[in-house]
């Protein structure tokens, strides 16, 4: 049974917390210097920094491949939608297309990367229901790119600064 607050909880800031905070901060600073919105790259960092490398690959991969599949699928669905309503503005059709797209998303994720369903669905919904007609392709591609940057940076940090390596360095 779920118990709140947990009896076994102890407040501490560990190496993973520090790596996540510093990496997200650095990615945000670089993005701000490039005058790009750092939100999705930072989210990629947070998803990509797991307890160890296998956990990072799993969680970062879920975010990356989900975003990739959801973003590309959103482009295709939006393209179909615009064949019927070139100016947009008909959300009922988008709702119907979303239902079909979610089935396709789940099938693609089951085949390529099963953990990608949730992040892929989020990207799909955001693109379909909150992206202007003029920018849906660029928006989708930017989300894929930014997520990839965040996840890749997180994986590199976790690879080059695993807990064991840092502990060994400080014990010298």
Regions found by a protein language model. Name each.
Residues 1-124, 129-172:
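Alpha-helical transmembrane segments and their membrane-interface boundaries
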């Amino acid at each position: 049974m779920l118990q709140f607050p947990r009896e076994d909880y102890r407040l501490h800031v560990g190496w993973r917390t520090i790596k996540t905070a510093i990496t997200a901060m650095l990615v945000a600073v670089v993005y701000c210097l490039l005058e790009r919105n750092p939100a999705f790259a930072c989210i990629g960092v947070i998803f990509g920094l797991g307890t160890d490398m296998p956990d990072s690959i799993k969680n970062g991969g879920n975010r990356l491949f989900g975003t990739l599949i959801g973003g590309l699928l959103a482009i295709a669905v939006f393209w179909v939608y615009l064949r019927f309503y070139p100016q947009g503005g008909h959300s009922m059709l988008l709702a119907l297309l979303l239902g079909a797209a979610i089935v396709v998303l789940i099938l693609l994720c089951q085949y390529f990367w099963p953990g990608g369903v949730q992040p892929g669905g989020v990207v799909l919904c955001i693109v379909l229901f909150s992206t202007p007609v003029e920018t849906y392709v660029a928006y989708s591609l930017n989300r894929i790119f930014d997520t990839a940057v965040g996840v890749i940076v997180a994986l590199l940090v976790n690879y080059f600064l695993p807990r064991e390596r840092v502990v060994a360095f400080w014990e010298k």
